[in-house]
Amino acid sequence: MGLAMGEREEVAMTKHNLERFFPYHTNHYPQALREIKAGEKGSHWIWYIFPQIKGLGTSSRSVKFGIENADEAREYLAHPILGHDLREITSALLELKENDPVKVMGWEIDAVKLKSCMTLFAYVSEEGSVFHKVLEKFFGGEMDEATLDLLKK
């Protein structure tokens, strides 16, 4: 139940400047979803598809697309495009037979970013969410401590 490409860019944005994710997210999401469904990330889109809490990375993309706090993470999940797509691509991870995050994400650093993203959104979601399930499947249920530390500040 997603929006058509033209509709995706007309959705009203929110107080946390979620419009910074567009057009990057819109342009790369279909490819990202194909790669995840195939079980092998091969291109560079992680910052605006699986965002992390701001403060973990220092690259310009990590800073630009970093989520400020739990309130912004909730707003991201409530967004009709960003929240829908994050849940959809996260659910696609659960459908894979592979449970090694490095094999799926292609690089150790991207596996770490995935864990950080899942921790962020699990933190603001009810127990048993798709984010908790991905943490269980790929990381033995362990959350990212650095993400939790930043969320508690």
Regions found by a protein language model. Name each.
Residues 33, 74, 118-119, 136:
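Amphipathic alpha-helical segments within well-ordered protein domains
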Residues 1-12:
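Short, Lys/Arg-enriched N-terminal segments with co-localized hydrophobic residues
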Residues 14-31:
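Short, conserved active-site entrance elements at the starts or edges of catalytic domains
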Residues 126-153:
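Charged phosphate-binding loop/patch that engages nucleotide di/tri-phosphates or the phosphate backbone
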Residues 55-61, 122-132:
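Short helix-capping/linker segments at secondary-structure and domain boundaries
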Residues 41-48, 85, 110-117, 130, ...:
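Residue-level detector of well-ordered alpha-helical segments, enriched
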Residues 75-121:
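Mid-chain, well-packed structural core segment of small domains
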